[in-house]
Amino acid sequence: MSNYIYSEKHFNFIDKIIKNRREKFYNFISEKVNLSNVKSYLDIGTTQNENHPSSNYLNKKFDFIKIHNAISDQIITDNRFSNILKKSITSDFSKEEIELIKSDFTISNATIEHVGSFKNQKKMISNMIKLTRNVMVIQTVNRYFPIETHTKLPLLHFLPKKKYRKLLKFL
């Protein structure tokens, strides 16, 4: 993920809406997955941005899970993680890397849309399967949600793709 898509200017009421949305997603997962059996957790696409209540929200909510692992192309300094691989989820993984971060529960929250082509998306899913022992969750942004969740700007993502991408470069 590129850092340029994350707006540093957040609006409190919008962050509350985003946080509420992430809380609903956490509740959905909690209803569907027996988290009491989960001993290790892998977050795909962890962000280095910890400045806002909605940043890495699920990682914080899963604090009762003993082992937290992360894969990110960003530099993650958070001490919450037991193991961090700084690489793309579409990269090839060695047997040692797989064994190091393979987890009971693997989640990708709004990452798959950043890996590019359909081929890369398939590679990401294939890698996630290799890195997951029991449960794998892939979530992507709902295009019809009124707030663009990376920049936290209302309606930005409804612009034509070319204008949207151009505007992201200025943020």
Across the structure, where does each feature detected by a protein language model lie?
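A conserved mid-domain beta-alpha-beta active-site/ligand-binding segment of alpha/beta enzyme cores
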Residues: 166-171
